[in-house]
Amino acid sequence: DIDNDGDTDLVLGNLGENFYLRASNNAPVKVYLKDFDKNGTIEKIFSHTINGEDMPVFLKKDITEQLPALKKENLKHQDFAPKTIQALFPNNLSDATVLTVNTAASIIAINNSNKGFTVQPLPYQLQLSSIQALVVDDINKDGNKDILAAGNFFDLLPQFCSIDASYGNLLLGNGKGGFIVAKPQQSGISINGQIKQVLPLQVKNQPGYLFLQNNQHPLYLRKTNAGKK
C-alpha cells in the first residue's frame, strides 16, 4: 500500500529506458511466436518500429542460423537490411502469436479501488538500468513504505551492450505515492553486480537485506538504527 489508502498498489521492474530497444504506444516492440520451420520448436522473432515499420531486431547471422531457410532469399546483408518482418515472412505471420511491448519503463501503479490504476514511471535514476529485484518496506521507520530496487542485466547478445548502470537504489516514500531517491551516501548502497533477488534477512536480531548476485557471493547490507544502510 504505497499511498496509505488501504488497497494494494503495484511496483513493477522492467528493462528501463536506457537500452537499444525503446518501446511506446506509437512505436512498439513486438515478439512473433511460431514454429516457423516446423521442427517442433517455437521460434521467437523480435521486431522494433523504425519509421512506422516493423524491422527485425536481430542481425542477419542470428536469424538465418535460427531459420536456415531464410538464407536463400537473404544471401547478402544488403538483401536482408531493408526488409520488414512482413517482407521476411510474407506467408507465415497470419497464424503467429504476436506479443506487443509498449513501454520498457519501470513503474508504480497506484490502485484507485474500482477506478483502475494510475500508472507513473519510477524516477529517472531507476530507468538507467533494468530492475530485477524489488523490496517494499518501511526502511527509514517513518510509517511510510519505501522501495529498495536493484538489477542490471548482462546476458545479452554481443550486438547489445550490457544493461549495467544500476548500483542499487533506495526510494523514500512520503505515504502519498511520491518518492525521493536517496543519495548513495545516505542509503549506503553501491553494488555493481547483476542482482537477481533481494531478501529481507535478520542476522543476530539485526534487520537487513541480502542481495543475490549472479556468479558472485551474496552481499548483506544491515540497517542502522537510523534506518539507513
Residue locations for each model-derived region?
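Beta-propeller-forming repeat regions
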Residues: 1-229
